[in-house]
Structure formats: C-alpha cells, structure tokens
C-alpha cells in the first residue's frame, strides 16, 4: 500500500473534492482508500458525500420479485437458480400487471420513491411477457415513481423499448471483481454483463450496478469491482452494496456473516470514488444493528430498500425503517402499508 496515496486521500481539501469526479482511478488508489483507518475513511467519505449530496436525502426503494425461481444461471449465492435444487424455492410465473401495480401503489403510499421489479430470467424473450413488463414500467411511472427493472441480459432493441416505456434505471450487478467472478458464476461472463450495461447506457437509461460482499472474495476483489464501476463514464446512477445472505441449499450456504464494518468500508469507498452515485445499502441490511446502519449513512450510503422482502430474502420491517430514518432526521410519511390497501 502506498502511504502517499493514503495521505492524499485523507488530506485533499473540500473545495478540490467538489470538482473531483474522476474516471481514471487505479486499483492501488482504491485499495488504499478502502484500507484507511476506519475513522479517517468515514470522515473522508462523509466530506465527499456532503460536498455532492444532501445528507438528509435517503432514497427509499421497494423491490418486488415479479417472476420467481427457475433461473438457468448458476450464480452460487442465488436460491432462484434452477441449479440449486436444495434451495426448494417454488417456481412462479410472471405476475399479472395489475397485481404488480397494486404493490407499487402500496409502496408509494408507504414512502417509497422508486419501485424495482426483478424477474429470474437469463434474458427476457420478446413477446407477451416482455410486453407485460413494459406495461408495468409505464404503470409505475404513471404513479409518479421511479421505475427500475432487473431482467438479465438485454439486447439493444430491448433496452430501447424499455427507455421508450419510461424506465428510470436498469439493475445489472457485476457481483464481484473480474478475477473472482469465475468462482461464483459460470453461465454468464463478465463481458456479458458489461455488454448489457453498455446497451442500457446507449438507450439513455440510468445504470444501477453494484455487487455482493462476503462470498469468499479478497479485499482486492472488492476493490477491482469498484474500479470497474468508478472508471465507467458516467458513473452508475446507483450502486447497490449487498452483504451475502447465505441461503440453505445454495453453494454459499455455509459462508459466515461478514463483519458489519466491511459494509461500512465498502459504502465509504464507493462514495469517495463515485461522489454523486446513489450508494444503496441493500441485501443483508437486516443483520445490521441500527448503529451499524447509521454508520453506513455517515459513510455515504444514501439509499435503502424499503419493505419486508428483497426478492426472496427477508428485509427490515417498514415500520422499523421509518423509525430509524426519523430518528436521524429524514422525513418519512406517517403512512403504513396496511393503510394503503
């Protein structure tokens, strides 16, 4: 590690920070930032965060699995993979449009700004199901919410049709760094993922792209993932930081939980190298204490998934999230999901 890099990372003046949107990071720089003393790292990330964002603006996003299970990919962390029979996840068809929009309306009433829809596909096929997804996107936008979908790999024409339907953002995570990637997934290449992100960007849709920590990767692998994201121009509009939820029946079922401070470091490093991105504290947040979550917010996280499930895994209860956000000074409407039904 370079002491010079650490010194520069911790001493740069706030005025310079405001101008410092970079796409030429090196792996050594990112790893040095990640490995700074924790208090210095959180302070540095908080300085960058406040230079570019309103610290009281924490976006709430709801996430719904609109088509569950039976995915042909072999992602080692995912219970929706058809390869992982031991996960015992029922395979379900695509939800009806009206049922999805009812969920979106309830999420909006409960304070969500963005509604995200996930389908367990390798790639969507043109036809009735893709047309239904387009209708869902139009419906969510009609409710006055941001709309995000994650459907797997896209063609350029599919990305363009989603853009025309009003899609705000497309989620397609890198999951990890390119060197470790092959240990987790064999059915889709890293370049496949990057190609879909390029299609999304060319269509004018916002990019939502992040990864997972706690799968057995090294700190270097985490830094490599952030390097790929930070050197894309422009930066992703949002960067989900997930902690592995080890699900029984998947190849990673026995992975131990990560140290919550690892999530703090990832949020802080992502904030420093991508100053204006939404850093989204995502899967695995349920295992964090209130204090650990607040530390992530201080380190630059400014978005959470709001609701009791994230696709197929448990999330914090909406009431608990509302109480937490109010306690740190974030306005949340006094409405519950039950009241919205």
UniProtKB/Swiss-Prot annotation:
UniProtKB keywords: 2Fe-2S, 4Fe-4S, Biotin biosynthesis, Iron, Iron-sulfur, Metal-binding, S-adenosyl-L-methionine, Transferase
Record-listed [2Fe-2S] cluster binding positions: 116, 148, 208, 280
One MF term in the entry's GO annotations: biotin synthase activity
Superkingdom in the source lineage: Bacteria
Oligomer status and interactors: Homodimer.
Recorded name of the encoding gene: bioB
Pathway: Cofactor biosynthesis; biotin biosynthesis; biotin from 7,8-diaminononanoate: step 2/2
NCBIfam families per UniProt: bioB
Protein name (record): Biotin synthase
Species: Methylorubrum populi (strain ATCC BAA-705 / NCIMB 13946 / BJ001)
Family: Belongs to the radical SAM superfamily. Biotin synthase family.
Catalyzed reactions per annotation: (4R,5S)-dethiobiotin + (sulfur carrier)-SH + 2 reduced [2Fe-2S]-[ferredoxin] + 2 S-adenosyl-L-methionine = (sulfur carrier)-H + biotin + 2 5'-deoxyadenosine + 2 L-methionine + 2 oxidized [2Fe-2S]-[ferredoxin]
Pfam name, any one: BATS
Listed GO biological process terms: biotin biosynthetic process
EC number: 2.8.1.6
PANTHER family in UniProt: BIOTIN SYNTHASE (PTHR22976), BIOTIN SYNTHASE, MITOCHONDRIAL (PTHR22976:SF2)
Organism phylogeny: Bacteria, Pseudomonadati, Pseudomonadota, Alphaproteobacteria, Hyphomicrobiales
């Amino acid at each position: 590690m370079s002491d010079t890099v650490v010194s520069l990372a911790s001493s740069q003046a706030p005025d310079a920070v405001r101008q410092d949107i970079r796409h030429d990071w090196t792996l050594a720089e990112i790893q040095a930032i990640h490995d700074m003393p924790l208090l210095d790292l959180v302070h540095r990330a908080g300085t960058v965060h406040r230079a570019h964002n309103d610290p009281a603006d924490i976006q709430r996003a709801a996430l719904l699995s609109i088509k569950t299970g039976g995915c042909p990919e072999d992602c080692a962390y995912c219970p929706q993979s058809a390869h992982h029979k031991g996960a015992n996840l029922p395979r379900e068809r695509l939800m009806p449009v009206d049922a999805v929009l009812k969920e979106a309306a309830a999420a909006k009433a409960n304070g969500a700004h963005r509604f995200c829809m996930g389908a367990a596909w390798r790639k969507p096929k043109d036809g009735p199901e893709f047309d239904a997804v387009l209708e869902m996107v139009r419906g969510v936008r009609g409710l006055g919410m941001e709309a995000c979908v994650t459907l797997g790999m896209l063609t350029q024409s599919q990305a363009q049709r989603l853009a025309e339907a009003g899609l705000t953002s497309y989620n397609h995570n890198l999951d990890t760094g390119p060197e470790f990637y092959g240990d987790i997934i064999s059915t889709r290449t890293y370049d496949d993922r990057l190609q879909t992100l390029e299609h999304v960007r060319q269509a004018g849709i916002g990019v939502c792209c992040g990864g997972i920590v706690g799968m057995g990767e090294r700190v270097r692998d985490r830094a490599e993932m952030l390097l790929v994201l930070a050197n894309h121009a422009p930066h992703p509009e949002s960067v989900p930081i997930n902690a592995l939820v080890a699900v029984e029946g998947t190849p990673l079922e026995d992975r131990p939980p990560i140290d919550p401070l690892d999530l703090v470091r990832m949020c802080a490093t992502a904030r420093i190298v991508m100053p204006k991105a939404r850093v989204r504290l995502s899967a695995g947040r349920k295992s964090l204490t209130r204090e650990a979550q607040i530390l992530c917010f201080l380190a630059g996280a400014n978005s959470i998934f709001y609701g009791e499930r994230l696709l197929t895994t448990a999330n914090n209860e909406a009431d608990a999230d509302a109480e937490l956000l109010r306690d740190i000074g974030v306005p949340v409407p006094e409405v519950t999901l039950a009241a919205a039904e």
